[in-house]
Amino acid sequence: MGKLGKEIVKLDVDILLKKLNSALADEWLAYYQYWIGAKIVKGPMKDAVISELDIHATEELGHATLIAARIVQLGGTPVLSPDEWAKVAGCRSE
């Protein structure tokens, strides 16, 4: 977004980038939870559960891809490591 665009919408890009990085961290953590869940699931309905978890993981990865692209478009740097994801994520997993 250019300078004029920022002035028109009265946007603080630094605040937006912080929120986008938080959302990106949430998406990466959700992706990982679905992905790893699909690897460790057991039981008689295992195949159906794996299929469902893989679908959700793919959706979360798609969200992460879109958010990362927007961060770069705005001149920011996406959070780069799992340590950073845990620090900036809006949701907390236990």
Task: Give short role names for the model-derived ranges.
Residues 30-37, 41-83:
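Conserved alpha-helical segments that form or flank metal/cofactor-binding pockets of metalloenzymes
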Residues 1-11, 33:
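Short alpha-helical hairpin
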Residues 8-20, 84-94:
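Acidic/His metal-coordination segments adjacent to aromatic residues that form catalytic metal sites
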Residues 16-26, 30, 56:
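Amphipathic alpha-helix face/heptad-repeat signature
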